[in-house]
């Protein structure tokens, strides 16, 4: 068995009090002694590597986020579907959960790549990760990094002549829906993913793309190109993931890469 399967088997052998304690430590803060045993089993499966994908939507009536499995979405009538706007895909896997935007960022003229910016600047509040640093794969601080990057570079021209932080700004300003086009303004707090979040996307790219393409064809799938993360390697390079092979590499901040924003879901839940 894999390490994760071993971990799940160990959890299943514990009594409920012990299971609750371990799951709370992992991050399932809503789990308690009153949680049904059937839900405990689902949490344990997730802790052991369960992949769960669903459509992330905004209900037009009140702006609340609602999530649908593919089966649930497909079972809705056209009239009921019209009550929701799809904004992306919620992924729950490897003890993470977040929403992946339904499309890559584009600029004002339709361009799909952005420079990272801040070339030659070591940004305060954004930790550098060198080669071989295993902590890179666990990073989940994309929103914090995005905010720090934008604050530090606002109106500042870097050593290559780039003003600001185009990739982080594109992620922050992303809108999955607008008042003008859709009748509802997207107020989701999007950000440039951490490398850990981007690696999770790469790991499950095939499954994510299957869900995306089931409703919009191939126009908005995760491509095979390089995608920026919000994690720096040093003052001149930031980490990327090459989605074709899932390679993880630092990329010069003067180069242009794709941006797929994500949004946090604060507490782990079923």
What feature does the model see in each segment?
Residues 2-186, 253-255, 262-270:
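Short, compositionally biased
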Residues 2-22, 195-270:
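C-terminal, surface-exposed recognition/capping segments
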């Amino acid at each position: 068995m894999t390490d994760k399967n071993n971990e799940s088997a160990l959890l299943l052998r514990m009594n409920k009090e012990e299971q609750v304690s371990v799951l709370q430590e992992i991050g399932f803060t809503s789990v308690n002694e009153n949680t049904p045993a059937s839900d405990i089993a689902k949490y344990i499966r997730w802790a052991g590597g369960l992949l769960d994908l669903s459509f992330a939507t905004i209900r037009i009536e009140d702006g609340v986020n609602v999530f649908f499995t593919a089966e649930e979405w497909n079972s809705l009538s056209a009239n009921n579907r019209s009550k929701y706007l799809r904004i992306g895909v919620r992924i729950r896997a490897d003890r993470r959960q977040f929403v992946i935007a339904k499309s890559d960022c584009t600029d004002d003229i339709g361009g799909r790549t952005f420079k990272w910016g801040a070339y030659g600047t070591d940004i305060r509040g954004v930790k550098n990760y060198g080669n071989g640093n295993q902590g890179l794969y666990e990073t989940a601080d994309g929103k914090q990094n995005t905010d720090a990057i934008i604050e530090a570079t606002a109106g500042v021209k870097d050593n290559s002549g780039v003003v600001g932080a185009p990739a982080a700004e594109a992620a922050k300003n992303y809108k999955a829906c607008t008042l003008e086009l859709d009748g509802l303004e997207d107020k989701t707090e999007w950000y440039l993913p951490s490398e850990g979040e981007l690696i999770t996307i790469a790991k499950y790219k095939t499954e994510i793309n299957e869900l995306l393409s089931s409703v919009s064809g191939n126009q908005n799938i995760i491509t095979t190109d390089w995608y920026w993360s919000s994690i720096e390697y040093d003052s001149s390079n930031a980490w990327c993931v090459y989605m074709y092979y899932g390679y993880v590499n630092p990329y010069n901040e003067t180069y242009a890469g794709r941006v797929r924003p994500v949004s946090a879901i604060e507490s782990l839940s079923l």
